[in-house]
């Protein structure tokens, strides 16, 4: 699912609620300036890419993945609902997971607004709120 022209700006918070599929291996949330580049990639990995029960954040720019960040807990369960909160400050994205654990991820592209949000993988997104 791709959502275009939905502005996410510095000072705002995005709240994503969904349900991981019962047999999910992974799913991802992507925020960026366009469909090619991703300033914040949140990849929830139950069993994918050689990782188990890990959240990996990264960015994708100019056709290349950058350095991975692995912080926070893993409050996700296959077949269960989840909530991901993303606070957008000038310097970083503060990602808060359902259990209250946090991931600090730099705003590597430095923009004050991103307009494309997409979701990949094995989760059903129920709501997206920006406030």
Label each region the model flagged.
Residues 64-83:
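Short, aromatic/His-centered strand-loop micro-motif at the edge of beta-sheets
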Residues 99-114:
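Short, solvent-exposed beta-strand-to-loop segments that form ligand-recognition rims
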Residues 7-9, 77-79, 88, 110:
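Surface-exposed coil/turn segments at beta-strand junctions on protein surfaces, enriched
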Residues 16, 84-103:
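Carbohydrate-binding surfaces in secreted/extracellular proteins
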Residues 23-25, 36-39, 92-94, 102-105, ...:
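Eukaryotic short linear interaction motifs
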Residues 53-63, 119-124:
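Short, surface-exposed secondary-structure junctions/capping segments
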Residues 1-58:
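Secretory/extracellular carbohydrate-interaction modules
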Residues 1-2, 118-131:
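C-terminal helix/juxtamembrane-tail motif
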């Amino acid at each position: 699912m791709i959502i275009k022209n939905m502005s996410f700006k510095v000072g705002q918070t995005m709240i994503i609620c969904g349900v991981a599929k019962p047999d999910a291996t992974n799913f991802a949330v992507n925020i960026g300036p366009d469909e090619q580049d991703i300033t914040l990639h949140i990849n929830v990995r139950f069993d994918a890419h050689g990782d188990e029960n890990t959240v990996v954040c990264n960015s994708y720019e100019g056709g290349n993945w950058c350095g991975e960040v692995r912080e926070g807990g893993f409050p996700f369960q296959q077949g269960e609902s989840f909530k991901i909160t993303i606070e957008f400050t000038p310097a970083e994205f503060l990602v808060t997971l359902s259990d209250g654990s946090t991931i600090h991820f730099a705003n590597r592209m430095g923009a004050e607004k991103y307009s494309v949000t997409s979701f990949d993988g094995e989760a059903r997104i129920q709501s997206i709120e920006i406030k």
